[in-house]
From Swiss-Prot:
Belongs to the CoaE family. This is Dephospho-CoA kinase. Its EC number is 2.7.1.24. Pathway: Cofactor biosynthesis; coenzyme A biosynthesis; CoA from (R)-pantothenate: step 5/5. PANTHER family: BIFUNCTIONAL COENZYME A SYNTHASE-RELATED, DEPHOSPHO-COA KINASE-RELATED. InterPro entries: Depp_CoAkinase (IPR001977), P-loop_NTPase (IPR027417). It comes from Rhizobium etli (strain ATCC 51251 / DSM 11541 / JCM 21823 / NBRC 15573 / CFN 42).
Amino acid sequence: MLKIGLTGSIGMGKSTVGKLFAEAGIPLNDSDAVVHNLYAGEAAPLVNAAFPGTMKDGAVDRHELGRQLALDPEGFKRLEAIVHPLVRKREMEFLAKQQADGAEMVLLDIPLLFETGAWERVDVIVVVSTDSQIQRQRVLAREDMTEEKFDMILSRQTPDAEKRRRADYLVDTSHSIAETRAQVLEIIAELKMRIAKGDFRNA
């Protein structure tokens, strides 16, 4: 079973590309969605223990957590030590199910693919990218986003140029959704051909 790692910096269109892969029939494990799910349940008391006052009605108050992290950027390490093992556990459960179901390939949407070393456990890396001005416009249009918050997030992510350099495939989201979809379908078609040729014998 071929494991495709999908990544891209904030505002590049990674989530949209992930959905396009899923629409094309590729099973998707979305790390962001898993974190949202964990914050609404299992991880909430653990996060609250490390960041007092961040739990509200049994779930993580993301706004309060973000406020505390902005004041103490070192807190990201504590948060990741709590969340990453839980996300990894869910990922392994997803992979086991897809393997049992006979999936030919799966997509792992991992925002911090390079930063966490997750790139080592995938067979192919797809990076989503766009022009830096388009990226900035998209991100600053989000609710509760500021220039300072955007710059802080970027500082924690591998630079786009480095991601592009390490990609096996690149999806450019600078243009229309139709053009983005065409790129995704082309990648899937090529990967299916490569699987048939035996390019991924260890996958």
